[in-house]
């Protein structure tokens, strides 16, 4: 189920304040965040976010195509180890 249109998109306030401060100072720093639920706004373009995936922070560089998506979509939480090998074929 998607979010109600009358509520609008969600962004953590501390994250938005950090980006606004970087934009006013014209700095490009990596912003470390645990907020995977925050929606990407146009002000975020050109910034790099270190998004936590449960174990480590994955760097995510924001481009125009990412607007409207959530930060967590670009930081996978599961690691695919591959399917098991067939031991009969190895001989």
UniProtKB/Swiss-Prot annotation:
Any single biological process term in GO: ribosomal small subunit assembly
Biased composition (Basic and acidic residues): 82-91
Keyword Nucleotide-binding: no
Molecular functions per Gene Ontology: rRNA binding; structural constituent of ribosome
NCBIfam families reported for this sequence: rpsS_bact
Chain's role: Protein S19 forms a complex with S13 that binds strongly to the 16S ribosomal RNA.
Protein name: Small ribosomal subunit protein uS19
Organism whose genome encodes this protein: Spiroplasma kunkelii
Taxonomic lineage of the native organism: Bacteria, Bacillati, Mycoplasmatota, Mollicutes, Entomoplasmatales
